[in-house]
Amino acid sequence: MVPPRRHRGAGRPGVLSSSPPFRLRSAKFSGIALEDLRRALKTRLQMVCVFIMNRMNSQNSGFTQRRRMALGIVILLLVDVIWVASSELTSYVFTQYNKPFFSTFAKTSMFVLYLLGFIIWKPWRQQCTRGLRGKHAAFFADAEGYFAACATDTTMNSSLSEPLYVPVKFHDLPSEKPESTNIDTEKTPKKSRVRFSNIMEIRQLPSNHALESKLSRMSYPVKEQESILKTVGKLTATQVAKISFFFCFVWFLANLSYQEALSDTQVAIVNILSSTSGLFTLILAAVFPSNSGDRFTLSKLLAVILSIGGVVLVNLSGSEKSAGRDTIGSIWSLAGAMLYAVYIVMIKRKVDREDKLDIPMFFGFVGLFNLLLLWPGFFLLHYTGFEDFEFPNKVVLMCIIINGLIGTVLSEFLWLWGCFLTSSLIGTLALSLTIPLSIIADMCMQKVQFSWLFFAGAIPVFFSFFIVTLLCHYNNWDPVMVGIRRIFAFICRKHRIQRVPEDSEQCESLISMHSVSQEDGDS
């Protein structure tokens, strides 16, 4: 057996051996392996962190939408309570002072109190004192184009997309090595390095929402640019006044129709016909949608029909005096329901976001225009004989003022805010909740007993309100249409012949590809 050949000087003392370089090289390889392992573990941890952050962010965005919906529902329920108390006070006033036009005019004119905000609220005064529109005409032209694009967008998301966290992949640059290997590495100064985050946040900006990116590149002073940014998202006082001028007539006619119906017809008939505002809102919102929550679905239609059926049962349980129905009062009720639906659908289409419109300023101008433009109606109604002008006594006047401040000024502001937070259909269906609540108030305060029809009708009214809320919350989910499609697909299904695994002749190729290739080669 031949011994292995040894290198010269191998194993001798005082002579350089070749084993230390091999050890250094193996140590270097092991260090590289440990570094790769450390980087792999770090990448895995980053991916876990990214998953957790994205999950939390999606939950937060869903929580924000749920919080808006919950706040809107609470506000609408509070409005129902206020309206029930207001209706009780209105019934007392009509027993002593049956003047629908005067009552509606007085309550609507109280909206002028909101215009005191120009004295108290500084941003409102700045819109009048500062010439922003003349000074920055081009800027506001871009802003109007931006908001016009927003108005045509039917989606709820009018800002940046939800953040997405992605790990950053740094490309390692080749390290600079010294030319001479004899230079001592300990004497070379260490270069200072900057640590960057290993996770980057990505947000996408829609093309029609790119005004903010243009504002960030403008050369205005910081304070001036900040003030413009605060006011550009809001409608100016002139624009709010124009919107109020149009909607003041619709709102006044809707309330006047309801008051006239109450004076001509029984309350039960008025409430039954007024509940059709939900149906008018559903139809108008489908024709003139303001957002994705106003899309027409079959489930919403059935919920509205369910609500109307419940209202009919509730009113039948509350009163049996239905023999003296007046046709004029029924027409007034239907007109009021239709005008109320036009009012809420058109204003949501005109103003797509609640932060774009100053709701107190809007109602303030509504009261101002009603006070300035509709006072000739007293002379017209007085000389035609429809309603004689008569000033009320102190008690009735105090009741009208209290009812106007709480039941009209405050409640209309809260109701419109709740409609912006939820949807126009939910806001109109919330009106139907006042009927069972008013009957409950009569049971508690006046000790009135109702039949089983009341309870049979109150349950559908409450259920329809919360059903539509859930349908709008879950992105216009239409379970009724889904069920109909599945039933139709089940009935119209075709019996298909399924392949049996044991039938080998069905899987056998009729033309052998190998034989075909051989014939092509021979030819």
From Swiss-Prot:
Taxon lineage: Eukaryota, Metazoa, Chordata, Craniata, Vertebrata
Compartments where found: Membrane
Gene responsible for this protein: SLC35F5
Domain EamA residue range list: 252-316
Record's keyword annotation contains Transmembrane: yes
Annotated positions of the Phosphoserine modification: 207
Native species: Pongo abelii
Record-given protein name: Solute carrier family 35 member F5
Keywords from the named record: Membrane, Phosphoprotein, Transmembrane, Transmembrane helix, Transport
GO CC term, one of those recorded: membrane
Membrane-related topology note: Multi-pass membrane protein
Role, per record: Putative solute transporter.
Family under the similarity heading: Belongs to the SLC35F solute transporter family.
Main location: membrane
Residues that span the membrane, as ranges: 69-89, 101-121, 243-263, 268-288, 296-316, 327-347, 361-381, 395-415, 420-440, 452-472
Keyword Transport carried by entry: yes
